[in-house]
Swiss-Prot record:
Its cofactor is [4Fe-4S] cluster. HAMAP family: Lipoyl_synth. The gene is lipA. It comes from the Bacteria. This is Lipoyl synthase. The lineage of its organism: Bacteria, Pseudomonadati, Pseudomonadota, Betaproteobacteria, Rhodocyclales.
Length: 314
């Protein structure tokens, strides 16, 4: 058994997943529409990175090797990752490390809230690794962080991007009510046919139920979910997931292109043309989503502030 606090990445992380990754001899060449803006150490990008190091805070932007980190940090926005940087799951599309996490840092809520206030962030996204080792899946820590940010920076709009709280959903939903965000996001990630391959340990119906039950309990909070394309799904399967999301009262949507972090992760099965993303966005509007961001470089938290504004949140 791995030692607590030791992070497994790449091949070590994915060695024990149920459906093994089959490496490709020649990865698909990235098309011209996949373009990433590099970060500049000056200005807001450098300011945010410096404060993250000073406060020993984590962002999913860095831990998951998000391609938009330069643009988002440069705009003065970041997605904070709470509850450590070691995940109890082994999802083979994700670059976050796996292992036995350390106990939650009791100082993290205050330190994160102080950073949000100091950086004068108008919109903050708070996410976490999966914490299957905790009785509540980390729900109370989410509440503590939300409350601390509300107190330190009352005008900041808060989006939480939560895990699935597997095996403890009812407890988690009860607890989350003690510190509600403005937007609750939980990513479906992919289509149900690919769950065992891409999301070992997760369950499609459970994730839908989490969002439906949360919305039923807290109807004033907007609900949101995100999908990736390029894992082996079809366009029709994506549309079917979108229908399922609407049937379970999810109001906001993001769809973006999957990019493999390394050769030890799931390979990209296809690069979806921007016109197809436009089709997804048009269909989302027809289905009644209040906000939909669908484009190759879109990620769950990418321009989340503008999407929330268009949905009447911020």
């Amino acid at each position: 058994m791995a030692e607590k606090g030791v992070k497994q990445k790449g091949e070590l992380k994915t060695a024990r997943i149920p459906i093994k990754i089959v490496p490709v001899d020649t990865p698909l060449r990235k098309p011209e529409w996949i373009r990433v803006k590099a970060g500049n150490s000056a200005g807001r990008f450098g300011e945010i990175k410096s404060m993250l190091r000073e406060k020993k805070l984590h962002t999913v932007c860095e831990e998951a090797a998000c391609p938009n980190i330069g643009e988002c940090f440069g705009r003065g926005t970041a997605t904070f990752m709470i509850l450590g940087d070691i995940c109890t799951r082994r999802c083979p599309f994700c670059d976050v490390g796996h292992g036995q996490p350390l106990p939650p840092n009791p100082n993290e809520p205050a330190e994160l809230a102080d950073s949000v206030s100091s950086l004068k962030l108008q919109y903050v996204v708070i996410t976490s690794v999966d914490r299957d080792d905790l009785r509540d899946g980390g729900a109370q820590h989410f509440v503590d962080v939300v409350r601390a940010v509300r107190e330190a920076s009352p005008k900041t709009t808060i989006e939480t991007l939560v895990p699935d709280f597997r095996g403890r959903m009812d407890i988690a939903i009860d607890i989350l009510g003690n510190g509600l965000p403005d937007v609750l996001n939980h990513n479906m990630e992919t289509v149900p046919r690919l769950y065992k391959q891409a999301r070992p340990g997760a369950d499609y119906a459970h994730s839908l139920a989490l969002m439906k039950q949360f919305k039923a309990r807290y109807p004033d909070v907007k609900t949101k979910s995100g999908l990736m394309v390029g894992l082996g799904e079809t366009d029709e399967e994506i549309l079917e997931v979108m229908r399922d999301l609407r049937a379970n009262d999810v109001e906001m949507l993001t769809i973006g292109q999957y990019l493999a972090p390394s050769g030890h992760h799931l390979p990209v099965s296809r690069y979806v043309h921007p016109d197809t993303f436009k089709m997804f966005e048009e269909e989302a509007k027809k289905m009644g989503f209040s906000g939909a961001a669908c484009a190759p470089m879109v990620r769950s938290s990418y321009w989340a502030d503008q999407q929330a504004h268009s949905a009447g949140v911020a």
